[in-house]
């Protein structure tokens, strides 16, 4: 079914509508009010809170601009048929149409669909321009919640690999989204700078420095040879390991900074053990009868708290296990530093540790629902038809630095945020080298460059944007213009959903959609051509500015630059 001709907009700028709530909120209140009216008129026991009214944009434009399933989810409570209830709701809504609604229609088994004039989109445009890059799309879903996001936390025993980089992009983008949505966010990297892996690193370093055979399980990468050439310290395994770990960590920091990942805190595992926090944490568990000794080791009764088996906290040789350190660390997060919520981003190889960590957190008196663990799945890279092989420098992994040097930091960020964290993914490096619409990085950044080009062309022609209050935004009626407006109107909802669902990839999808819509507008709607009405040209210039704002917000959340030229 083809879409009927859309009615002309009733709204210019500034708007005369005094209700500045988002259209979604207005429709929700209208629907809740209609439910109340139907309940009174028909004697139904039915009350609906506006916040529970589900509204969505239909997948097909011919079904209208907004749709609600309220009749289907409340019909049973009301003791009536969903379609009959929807029919009554349509009749009530038609008596007093909400602003911008031109028709309300019954569809399918009980959907209520709304068709709107274009004025709601012009209102959204005015909101983008009034609030700007700093103010638009800042839905307060966090209400000041203090959230710590721990991510990457790779052992400082070798160069950071692609998997860590990909999961790092997720953690950083999630932190950016949370910060924009009313959360107080702290980004943290947990440095595993003690224990067996540091001693193994020390033995590997000393073996290379002395020309001896590598120890079993030693680190084989060329970076160890480079470090050995610099080392002039004592022949002490722990001292050598700590020295090498410090140098490697400096390199990790530089690598991550090159893709815009900056941490608020680098938290040392060694500092936890040296402070006595591990012993204190074990003592707290012991006081609850959750610790026992067996075979010379100290065990945690985690099975009785939902784990598949009990876990060792301290080995027979006296070394604390990763779990013991993690529990002391999370005790510090929740009970010492007082975070309301902690989000840990781990690699999938940590899957077996989640239940024991949750059990330990609960045993320490923390509601385990306050701890969220996100597991990043395996990442594979191809280059055209060729699998990207592990490099000699990293030893047993694909080096993130190599990828950044090849495709650049922006491409690395966007590529790593193209698919969900919990899906094993294969990425083609060749796809982000092409200057074509198939290259998501080029396609998105070209939209930004075209926006910059419009500004340069306007300056060249000495065309200045008139004050917004003088602009008639209702002139923007071309389908391509409306596509851009719809996309901009969606951004606050997209950002909110990305925060609630912990899914920054939703922003990636939106950015690509805006870029596509802007390219269509740029191609079909001349802005500064001689035959364009000056009033329309001014409205289009403001639409370009709104697109710049939206793209800057979206790319900023992804940690990607918005170039003014390419």
Spans of features found by a protein language model:
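Non-catalytic interaction-recognition regions
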Residues: 2-122, 129-566
């Amino acid at each position: 079914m083809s879409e009927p001709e859309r009615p002309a907009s009733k709204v210019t700028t500034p708007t005369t509508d005094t209700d500045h709530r988002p259209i979604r909120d207005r429709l929700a209140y209208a629907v809740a009010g209609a439910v109340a009216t139907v309940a009174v008129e028909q004697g139904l026991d039915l009350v609906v809170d506006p916040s529970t009214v589900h509204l969505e944009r239909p997948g097909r434009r011919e079904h209208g601009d907004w749709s609600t399933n309220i009749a289907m989810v409340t019909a049973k409570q009301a003791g009536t048929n969903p379609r009959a209830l929807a029919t009554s709701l349509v009749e009530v809504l038609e008596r007093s149409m909400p602003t911008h609604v031109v028709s309300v229609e019954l569809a399918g088994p009980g959907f209520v669909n709304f068709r709107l004039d274009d004025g709601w989109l012009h209102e959204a445009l005015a909101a983008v321009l009034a609030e700007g890059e700093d103010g638009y799309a800042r839905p307060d879903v966090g209400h000041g919640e203090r959230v710590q996001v721990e991510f990457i936390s790779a052992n400082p025993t070798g160069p950071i690999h692609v998997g860590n980089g990909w999961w790092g992009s997720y953690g950083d983008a999630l932190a950016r989204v949370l910060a924009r949505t009313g959360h107080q966010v702290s980004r943290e990297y947990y440095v595993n700078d003690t224990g067996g892996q540091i001693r193994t690193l020390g033995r590997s370093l000393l073996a290379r420095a002395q020309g001896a055979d590598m120890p079993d399980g030693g680190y084989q990468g060329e970076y160890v040879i480079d470090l050995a050439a610099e080392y002039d310290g004592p022949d002490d395994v722990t001292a050598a390991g700590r020295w090498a770990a410090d140098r490697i960590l400096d390199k990790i920091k530089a690598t991550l900074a090159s893709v815009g990942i900056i941490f608020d805190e680098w938290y040392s595992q060694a500092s936890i053990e040296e402070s006595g926090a591990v012993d204190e944490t074990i003592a707290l568990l012991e006081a609850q009868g959750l610790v026992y000794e067996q075979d010379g080791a100290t065990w945690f009764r985690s099975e009785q708290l939902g784990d598949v088996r009990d876990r060792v906290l301290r080995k027979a040789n006296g070394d604390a296990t990763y779990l013991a350190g993690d529990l002391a660390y999370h005790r510090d997060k929740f009970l010492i530093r007082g975070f309301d919520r902690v989000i840990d981003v781990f690699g999938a190889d940590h899957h077996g540790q989640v239940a024991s960590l949750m059990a330990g957190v609960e045993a320490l008196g923390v509601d385990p629902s306050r701890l969220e663990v996100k597991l990043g799945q395996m990442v594979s890279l191809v280059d055209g038809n060729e699998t990207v092989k592990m490099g000699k420098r990293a030893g047993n992994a694909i080096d993130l630095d190599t990828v950044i040097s090849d495709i650049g930091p922006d491409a690395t960020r966007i590529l790593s945020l193209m698919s969900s964290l919990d899906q094993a993914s294969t990425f083609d490096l060749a796809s982000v080298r092409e200057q074509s619409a198939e290259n998501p990085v080029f396609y998105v950044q070209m939209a930004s460059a075209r926006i910059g080009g419009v500004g340069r062309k306007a300056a060249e022609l000495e065309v200045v944007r008139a004050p917004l209050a003088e602009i008639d935004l209702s002139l923007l009626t071309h389908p391509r213009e409306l596509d851009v407006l719809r996309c901009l109107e969606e951004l606050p909802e997209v950002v909110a959903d990305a925060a609630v669902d912990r899914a920054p990839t939703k922003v990636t999808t939106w950015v690509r959609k805006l870029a596509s819509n802007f390219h269509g507008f740029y191609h079909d709607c001349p802005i500064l051509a001689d035959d364009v009405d000056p009033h329309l040209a001014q409205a289009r210039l403001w639409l370009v500015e709104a697109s710049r704002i939206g793209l800057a917000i979206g790319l900023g959340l992804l940690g990607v630059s918005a170039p003014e030229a390419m």
